[in-house]
Amino acid sequence: MKGYAMLKIGESGWIEKDRPVCGPMDAICKPLALAICTSDIHTLWEGAIGERHNMILGHEGCAEIVEVGELVKGFKVGDRVLVPAITPDWNSLEAQAGYSMHSGGMLAGWKFSNFKDGVFSEYFHVNDADGNLALLPDNIN
């Protein structure tokens, strides 16, 4: 699949990557509408979170679910969803203590374009789908 990535600090471009794999609590989504954020700019041009190589950018948007894990209860293939910038692991000790932004370590709740590929791609992975996605109502287009 194609994705728009930070190749290194100060350099971006289109790259090819494998389609993400869906875990039992996760979802694979296809973007419908995306938004660039100043965090993407700071990450790319200033290395705000350190050097990243071939890391697909983007961490906010709307999408259609194309695959769900067998333990996902609240979503199905074809659902349109809102995807937040912060997607913690809700079963982590940090999230349970109220620090979801730091689930798994400092800033580890901010996964897209930080610890894993972001949403500026043909498909992207959302961990813990039941806790990290919101259904987009049918009357909103």
What are these regions (language model features)?
Residues M1-Y4:
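Short structural boundary motif marking the start of a folded domain
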Residues L7, D18-R19, R52-G58, K111-D117, ...:
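Short Gly/Pro-enriched turn/cap motifs at secondary-structure boundaries
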Residues K8-G10, G23:
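Residue-level recognition of beta-strand termini and adjacent short loop/turns
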Residues G10-I15, T38-S39:
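Short N-terminal binding/cap micro-motifs at the start of the first secondary-structure element
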Residues P20-L34, W45-Q96, P137-N139:
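Glycine-rich beta-strand-centered segment in the early N-terminal region that forms part
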Residues S39-W45:
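Cytochrome P450 core scaffold surrounding the K-helix E-X-X-R motif
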Residues I41, G74-K76, S103:
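Short, solvent-exposed secondary-structure boundary/capping segments
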Residues D89-N141:
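NAD(P)H dinucleotide-binding glycine-rich loop of Rossmann-like/cofactor-binding domains
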